[in-house]
Amino acid sequence: MKFKAPAFLIALALTAPLALSAQADGPALPAAATADQATTSKLVYGLLSDSRYAYRPRALDEATSKDVFKRYLETLDGGKQFFTQADVAKFAPFEAGIATAIRGGELEPAFQVFSVYKQRVGQRVGYARNLLKREPDFSTDERFEYDRKDVPWAANDAELDELWRKSVKNDWLRLKLAGKKPDEIRTTLDKRYATLEKSVNELKGEDVFQFFLNAYTSAVD
């Protein structure tokens, strides 16, 4: 009997050499996939859609494309803290064309979505750090919702502002209850938020490619 590998093993085998190369070169984030990444995308699709290789081959139909798109957004913004409904609506053409993108290795839309994500992270972090200039108002009882997986995307920037205001207030309160002084809290949170932005800014093209390909392989596995 011929062995049929799970989707994630096939993808890992094909992308590992690319990851090692990216670590060695450390390129800046590109606007599109490299030629090698495009080829890998086509190879992974060919293997995962062929019953000779995949344990459970699955076609890239409309339902699967929607699942890939959903998983990719969850990878980037699982807490729905950065994208707005307007952002997600603008990504609709990408969702509709995911099958074509993967089959043809034309992954520019995935990089475009990430570019928007990177911008939104910068905006949100800037807003959060600005809030630290003043101690939150603890005279009102408010609830911060940790698990936001099933909530809708924020309707607009104003909703995100409110979400982040509560998030910063919650972060501040936790440190305050731990006995930290206002200046200590401000310094700690400022570093925390700056580190978040820095970690996103340091992501490379290979990381974006892996995020998207993982969304695909997990959707069909």
Predicted regions and their residues:
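Flexible, low-complexity junctional segments that flank or bridge functional domains
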Residues: 2-10, 19-221
